[in-house]
């Protein structure tokens, strides 16, 4: 199955669970300590990332969804860092601050790509009051279409049954990343995402696919779940539902560097996709593709909507289609080595019309390869105002990539593509409209590198704004 990306901007997701701050210290090791037989790390860099349930929220936001997170923290510096970081990513934070506890923090010391030690700063939350979380749920539920509960057994989900009942009473599906062998506490949830070890901790050793399906169905019946999605590492993932055939997906991972946070990514993409209107099968296929991307990254990682689109459409073949900036730069190098002339243009291309197609055909005729750089949704909104774009980035890029004239489609988030153009440095930069070559973003850089800048005419009578106005006016 090769699913189509949904509009994640329509996906509101509430995340409840164990929030953490992941800290990383990086540096070389060149000697052994004289005090003990351990390496000495000269710390040269550090990094802070939201982890646990906070990483789930960050994944939702990275996809373009609307994340609202509720969790327990201390009243300390890590809680402040978490809140500021998540707010900067447009995640709505609604933490319950408990002064007698520290915010869960994990410090990893890294050298040469290897983790040398992890230090955990935490106390399990116990005998907490459910009401502060329930009241926050009451406020959040009307604006979400899915609830994720991220359980790391740190105590934030001590009252998980009350939270499940609250969400289900509002007809909101509940997706749970479980911890531990007690699935009774998750009774009535919509879907659980245990990994193979977690699954076998509950049902015992599984020796075949058939046995996995039978034991999973027994759990679904016993605990009144709608489904289980068992993630099976190199064996992919299997969706088991009552009254339906099992749905299996092979792994899409090319290389595995770090599985930290992979479960967070699976449940994030799964729930956000369902919230955006996808079926369980389609949502699982998207989650499987996402997992294949993040295990190739180091540390707790998110992925963007663009990376997910590339994973689905096979971005390893960089001859054509939607492509990342780094992959584009490499593809352009290969094209130049073959003596191909690279042409580049840019625009919003919100509603593709005949004028756009004519313009792009003309641009393609001027060289061997045509790159189209596309403004992301936030960039379009800043340039065009409220109500734009009509079509989200992934859909605009998919339509452009389907045109025979276009070789590569790449997004950019700035107001102009000047930085991107200066990285790519095409042989020919073209722009449609009433411009002078020196006024075109990136033109100076292209000319300085020995390239050319040209202005092409748009076909008269074609305008995205006119099309939108006609639709609003009920014409045509």
From Swiss-Prot:
Known catalytic reactions: D-glycero-beta-D-manno-heptose 7-phosphate + ATP = D-glycero-beta-D-manno-heptose 1,7-bisphosphate + ADP + H(+); D-glycero-beta-D-manno-heptose 1-phosphate + ATP + H(+) = ADP-D-glycero-beta-D-manno-heptose + diphosphate
Broad EC category: transferase
Region (Cytidylyltransferase): 344-476
Gene Ontology terms: cellular component: cytosol
Catalytic residues of the enzyme: 264
EC number: 2.7.1.167, 2.7.7.70
Keyword match Ribonucleoprotein: no
Annotated positions binding ATP: 195-198
UniProt entry keywords in alphabetical sequence: ATP-binding, Carbohydrate metabolism, Kinase, Multifunctional enzyme, Nucleotide-binding, Nucleotidyltransferase, Transferase
Highest taxon of source: Bacteria
InterPro entries membership: Bifunc_HldE, Carboh/pur_kinase_PfkB_CS, Cyt_trans-like, PfkB_dom, RfaE_dom_I, RfaE_dom_II, Ribokinase-like, Rossmann-like_a/b/a_fold
GO biological process, one term: ADP-L-glycero-beta-D-manno-heptose biosynthetic process
SUPFAM superfamilies, per the entry: Nucleotidylyl transferase, Ribokinase-like
Keyword set includes Membrane: no
Gene Ontology MF terms in the entry: ATP binding; heptose 7-phosphate kinase activity; heptose-1-phosphate adenylyltransferase activity; phosphotransferase activity, alcohol group as acceptor
Region (Ribokinase): 1-318
Pathway given in the UniProt record: Nucleotide-sugar biosynthesis; ADP-L-glycero-beta-D-manno-heptose biosynthesis; ADP-L-glycero-beta-D-manno-heptose from D-glycero-beta-D-manno-heptose 7-phosphate: step 1/4; Nucleotide-sugar biosynthesis; ADP-L-glycero-beta-D-manno-heptose biosynthesis; ADP-L-glycero-beta-D-manno-heptose from D-glycero-beta-D-manno-heptose 7-phosphate: step 3/4
Family classification: In the N-terminal section; belongs to the carbohydrate kinase PfkB family.
Subunit structure: Homodimer.
Function statement: Catalyzes the ADP transfer from ATP to D-glycero-beta-D-manno-heptose 1-phosphate, yielding ADP-D-glycero-beta-D-manno-heptose.
Name listed for the protein in its UniProt record: Bifunctional protein HldE
Source species: Vibrio campbellii (strain ATCC BAA-1116)
Gene name, Swiss-Prot/TrEMBL: hldE
